[in-house]
Structure formats: C-alpha cells, structure tokens
C-alpha cells in the first residue's frame, strides 16, 4: 500500500520550475515501445484500459486496472526519474548526498510531448546558476532513463525499435553533458530591459495550488480523463491532465488530491482575511477617501506620438525582435508595416533612418563574434564541416585559425585587426571570407570604383569585407587606421565625415596588398606597418569543383567550439599556441603522426590538438558496434543487447566537445591474399606500445605466433633451396614479359594487343608476402 504525501506547509527558497520533455517525437504512435522499455509487464493492463467505460458508469474492471497501475505506468517512471535527477542535482549544489530541499515532480501527457514539471527550491540554487543547470539536469534525467532500460536489457535483448529509443536517450545524454540541451529542458524566465533572459523565481505553494493540483488524471493518450479519473476526484472546470505526481519522494494519490488542495487553500496559503487591508476584513466597508483636488502646474503634459512616429517605433521593435538588418529583410518579414510607413511623406528616408538607428544599436550591443552566436546559437561542431576541411587542405590547424578569428572578431587581437586570405584562384579564399561575413550579416564592402568614397559603406557595421584588396596611395593612410582597428574619420557621400569605430576587416585577394600603387610607381614604404596590422593566411592548393560552398552555420560551429574551449584574447592565444609574437604569416599546422590523411575519411571525428581527422581502424570487425548497425538498418537482435556499443563508432560519428579517443590502426589480412606472416620490422613498428583491449591482444598474439613460425621455417627452406641444383635460365624477351603480364600480341597486324587477365589475379611474390600483414 502506497503512502500519500502529507500536505507541504513550507517550501524552501529560492524556488524555480523546470519542464523536461521526453526526447522522442513519435511516442504517441509507438506508445507500446514506452510500455515495454520503461514499464514492462503493463502492456496487457494498458490495452484493457482502452475498452473500459467512462464514469458515471460503474466498471469494476476499470477500478482494478487503475489500482494496479498506480505508480507502475511509464508516466510514473518518468516522474520518478526526474525526481531522482533533481535530488542528485541539489546534492551536487549543496555538496552532500542528502540535500535539504523541496522537490515536486508531475508528469503530464501534452499535445506534442510527454513532459514533467519540476518545482525545486533550496540552498545552492540561485537566479544566476538555475539557468545554467538545465544541461546538468537533462543529463541526469537521461542517465536515469537509460539505466531503467538496461534493467530490461538484463532480461532480454532489445527489439530494433527499442534499440533506436535507447541510443536516442544515450545521444541526448552525451549532448547534455557537453552543454547542449536541444530545447528538451526549459526553465521559467523573464526578460530584462536589455532583452536578456534570466531565471524567474516563483512562489511554489501558489504555483502548486493554481497549476499543479487542479487537473484530472490521464495515463495514456489512447485513453480519456473520465476513464482514468474516478467521479469523486473529478475537477469539473479543469481542462488539463496529469499522469503522476511526486511530492518530496512520496506519490500524491488520486483520492487525496482534492483534500490536499482544500487544506492547502484553508490553512497553508493565506486567504483574503489575513491580507493587509488596514486592519479590516475582506468584505468590510472600505475606508473613506477625502476630497482630492488637482494641483495646478505649469509643467507640460506628456508628449503623445503621432501615427508616423508610432510606425517608426513599431518597425524598430520588429527589427530588434526578428534581427532585420536590410531592406530585403523588412519586405519578407513585415511587408504590411513597411507599406504603411512607405505611404507616409518621405517614407523611404524614414525607413533608412530606422535601419540606421537599428545598426547603431546592434553595433553598440554586440561585436561581430557575439552577434554571430546570437544569430546561430548552440551550434555543434561536426567532423564533416567544410570550413574544417578547407583549413586542413591548405595546411593550417583549423582550431588555431578559429581561435585567431574569434579573437579578431571579438576585438581582442590587439593591433592585428585584419585577416587576409591570400592565394591564387579557386583555393577557397572568397568561399571562406563570404561565409564569415554572411554569418555576421551586418557587414560593409570596400568599393574601389568610387575612389573618392572608398569606405562609404563601412560605417555602422560589425565587420568589413575587402574583396580583391588593392592598396593605392589615395587611401593607404585611412586603410592603415582601419586595418589596425584605430578610430578614424571617413568621408561619406552627400554627408559630413563620420567617425569609424574599431571594426574587424576580412580581406580576400590575390594581389600584394603591401605594395602601394600610385600613378606609374610602386612603393614598399608602407609594407612594414601594413604587415603589423594584418594576419595573413596563404591558400595555395586549388579545391575540386565539387567542394561546395561553406555555409555560415559551419563557420558558427567552428568559432563557437573555439570560443567555448579557449580564452579568446591575445594573451590567451599566445599562451595556448606557445607564441612569443603573432606573425604576419599565420603559422602552418603540425598534424599528429597518425593523422596524416587525405582529409576524406572524417567519420571518426577530429583531434582537439592538431585539428586533423582521427584515423580509421583497418579492422572493421573490431570496432563494429550496435549503434552503427542499428542506424544502417541491419539490426541483429543478438547484438542489440550489447551495451558496449554505446562507446564505439556511434559516439565517434556524433562529434561534440568531447572528441573520440584515438585508436591504433591494425591492418587485417586481405581475404584474397595468401596466408603469410608479418615481417619483423613491420611487427615492431605496429606494436610499439602494449595492447589496450582484448581485441588488440588477440591480434598481437596471432601475429607473434605467425612470426615465430616463419622464423623457424626459414632455415629449412634455405637448406632445401641449397640442396637443389640450380639451372641457368635464359632472360625473357619482350614477348615473354608481355605474356607474363597478361598481354599477348594480336594475330592481325595493326590491332592492339589482347589483355588476358587482370593484374589483381597475379600471386604476390615471396618478397612481398611479409608486407600483407601487420602494417599499414
């Protein structure tokens, strides 16, 4: 018999409310999978519940089923997992296994997701860390659910559909430990004057009274509330439902719910009679108010905006809310508001003024890097990122380049305020530069054709793009100020000169930007100061035509990973990469010894030191796991029960902030090649260190025994060869060599020779047999 939770009379402060969603989209259509995974043994009862009659009809079978499913259905299991995870989180905050806190968890069946409301309060949780704790809470909940699934795995192997849900829970858990919640957990927040969101403390008892308790019971989307709720516990005006409620570890039973609510209203939460009404009761006569007189004042009344000004204010709010930066964005996002403003006198100029004000506001609030993250939040770096691959092809460490770009875009690189991509055509210069500036979106371009106003488009911008930069003596002096991040005044057409703040510059060119052209002379006087302001990357390798364009999202993924991992300042960059001075020519990358590839095999992830792709294993059988077989569609029920697959190839393919472990490359003997032993040098090169697991130990013992057999049989073969008489063999002529190679001369003159067989069928010689096993 379950004990019902007593009425909670005081709740620990501060208190916050979370909502955790079950990360499976099609759970309603495949509800039977949740029965078998989370609540095995309840399938028959849940099916019988569908056929039960709703109240007020008497159905004894319905009462027995609901009594049997009291806290055994999957909604109750989900609520228990959330309660255990929240208790663990508060224990971490208070650094004790027995935290002093109050926790209320209620699972509900929503219109889209199965979710759980969590009310938690106690020491260690504050407005500053409650929002950050979402990822930790999600990871703990997913860990509890996967542990519940493993209990079923001890009894029987998973079905393919069950294995998909299990691996989905494991993936969400790994992403949560990396800081990515994926909108699977939320917290009640409020927005301040600057538009930032913060965690909102709540009154937990009133939240419990008005939102949590007055709901009817529903434990399955295929059933109805009037079937799952008894008539005595029915809330007439309630239109929302719940599945299971836990208060401080004890379940709140259905028949105690109304009594709990009544006691909470009458005794715990103060009613109107106890509120401050100046000593009077709630329904007594209000105090009399004396005669009020208006005080005459000479002060002017508040100003009321006219229609045109209200339209401008509304448009400015829309630009801030939807990140509208150019006229085309206004046309696509709010055409009605744009038409109303265009209809006003001087409407086109008013729209330009509104966009200009919004640009000033964005430039004052963000840097190019923070605005890029604002437009592309919570991006996860994957190994098939084209920006990563391009930098590897050009010989650079992509993580080091990303670190430098973060410092420049965040205005933390000192005097080096410019990144220049230099090289011949079709090497990816413009591709990379365009992805950066399009990711920021608020950028200006330098126009050589308008020689009097070259930097006319660079004011009120987060970043400047100088495509095919060419340095001329007419603008070399303001260019040095802009490239170095120094404030200067620039000329604007039809306006006075304006002040240009520090703005990062991206250059893509195949010209020598350090040579200043003027008339018929070329000067190198400005080369040294220009090199001190520019960080140059030389792209010299041409890309294939099928490489594709780098998207702004891929740039955001790379920069966000670097921003989270490194200190994006000049000091942090120099300390991380052991540099005394950041040179003009960016240093090339130094790949790890095992990461020298052709940058094609990227499924194993990337190295967090050199940025190169992790090598693949030559023995596919050793590193085959359940997750890869499940996603490819070849499901083996025997292998689905192997929980070791969660740490193998599936984790390596899902690249997050925790890179995959490096593996030893062990070559397997090709099936078509003859059985031959490894050579001693190849064997020693391969096994320079001890085997790290059972598979490598097995391969090591096989190769060692084969090498020992070859060593013993070598003297016997030499003696047999010395005993046989050697006959002189004539040297073959070109025709004989052609027959050995599988090429015979044609019978008809003038026709090409006939190829009899392929070179792949030739048996390897004795000298090459030792190279087939044990080495790459």
UniProtKB/Swiss-Prot annotation:
The endonuclease active site can probably bind other divalent cations. SUPFAM superfamilies: P-loop containing nucleoside triphosphate hydrolases. Residues 397-552 form the SF3 helicase domain. Residues 11-271 form the PV NS1-Nuc domain. Coiled coil: none annotated. Residues 703-713 have a biased composition (Polar residues). The active site is at 211 (for nuclease activity). Its EC number is 3.1.21.-, 3.6.4.12. Residues 667-681 have a biased composition (Low complexity). It catalyses: ATP + H2O = ADP + phosphate + H(+). Keywords: ATP-binding, Covalent protein-DNA linkage, DNA replication, DNA-binding, Endonuclease, Helicase, Host nucleus, Hydrolase, Magnesium, Metal-binding, Multifunctional enzyme, Nuclease, Nucleotide-binding, Transcription, Transcription regulation, Viral DNA replication. It is found in: Host nucleus. One of its GO terms (cellular component) is host cell nucleus. GO terms for biological process: DNA replication; viral DNA genome replication. ATP binds at residues 423-430. Pfam families: HBoV_NS1-like_N, Parvo_NS1. Residues 193-197 are annotated as: Ori-binding. PROSITE patterns: PV_NS1_NUC (PS52022), SF3_HELICASE_1 (PS51206). Its main location: host cell. Residues 628-752 are annotated as: Disordered. A motif (RCR-3) lies at residues 211-215. A divalent metal cation binds at residues 108, 115, 117. Its cofactor is Mg(2+). GO terms for molecular function: ATP binding; ATP hydrolysis activity; DNA binding; endonuclease activity; helicase activity; metal ion binding. Homooligomer; when bound to DNA. This is Initiator protein NS1. It comes from Human bocavirus 2 (HBoV2). The lineage of its organism: Viruses, Monodnaviria, Shotokuvirae, Cossaviricota, Quintoviricetes.
